Every structure is written in structure tokens, then in C-alpha cells.
Amino acid sequence: MQIVPIKTEYIALGQFLKLADCISTGGQAKSFLEETKITVNGEAENRRGKKLYHDYIVDVEGFGPFKVVRS
């Protein structure tokens, strides 16, 4: 499981995907979410504005699981 550190209280899923190097630009988030299976704490998610908090587990198909950690 890869750790993705954040400095704020939460991060939006679209921003997270860019930070985790799943996408190269924020503009790709919408289409990426439509085409890729993503779960947040075990539940399917496709909203790029979904807030991710410390200790959330995000599983991105083709990239593996990530853990959000506030640093």
C-alpha cells in the first residue's frame, strides 16, 4: 500500500489522483473517474469532489491501494 501525504484536513478525490500520479493533469480526473473503478474505504466512488480524510483507503484499479495520511 502506498502512502499519500496531505498537509490539509482533507483532499478532493480529483486532486488526490493527480498527487498519487494516477493522472497527469486535473482536467483528466472526470474521464478517469468514469472509466476506472475506484473505491474509498471499500465503497465505489466516482465523484471527483469527494473529500478524503486522514486514514482513508483509496483503491484505484490498475494502480493499487493508497492510504491518505495527514503530515
Residue ranges and their predicted role:
Residues 1-11:
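A detector for short, charged/polar N-terminal pre-domain segments
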Residues 2, 34-36, 62-66:
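Generic structural motif recognizing short loop/turn segments at the entrances and edges of beta-strands
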Residues 3, 16, 57:
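Short aromatic/hydrophobic contact patches that present stacked aromatics
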Residues 12-54:
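A basic, amphipathic helix-loop patch mediating RNA/tRNA/ribosome contacts
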Residues 45-71:
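C-terminal structural segments of small proteins and small subunits
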